[in-house]
Regions:
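Basic, Lys/Arg-enriched alpha-helical interface segments
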Residues: 1-85
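Enriched for short, Lys/Arg-rich terminal
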Residues: 2-4, 82-124
Length: 124
């Protein structure tokens, strides 16, 4: 992704996060959150695309949010971004590291239905 200043940004996902997304597709389909496997794939793809696009934008605008100390077990100097679909009760949180001001590595992802979400402070 290229920002308005011409700088290239790169967002990558750790192997653990990639595995989580593949498992999420199966879970969403098996638990009948989606009636068709392709719908579950599309939903997960939407989450991935959102974070690939928005994480660099947030950083460029100086709106990156520092992750709470609890999440530092997943990496040093973590930031996080949130995604919520319109009319959805689920918010996804991606925790990421920043390298060289233009590389972003998503190292952990959760949603508001997990126990870990209790550690997210919303006024940061």
């Amino acid at each position: 992704m290229k920002n308005t200043l011409g700088k290239n940004y790169h967002v990558v996902f750790s192997e653990d996060v990639k595995s989580f997304f593949f498992e999420l597709i199966d879970i969403l389909f098996q638990k009948e959150y989606f009636g068709f496997l392709d719908e579950a794939k599309e939903y997960v793809s939407e989450i991935v695309q959102y974070f690939e696009t928005e994480i660099p934008k947030l950083h460029q605008l100086g709106l990156s949010k520092k992750a709470m100390p609890y999440f530092q077990k997943y990496g040093e100097n973590l930031f996080f971004a949130a995604y919520r679909r319109t009319k959805s009760r689920t918010t996804w949180y991606a925790f990421y590291e920043i390298f060289d001001e233009r590389y972003f590595k998503v190292v952990h992802i959760i949603n508001n239905h997990t126990e870990e979400s209790a550690y997210i402070v919303h006024n940061t």
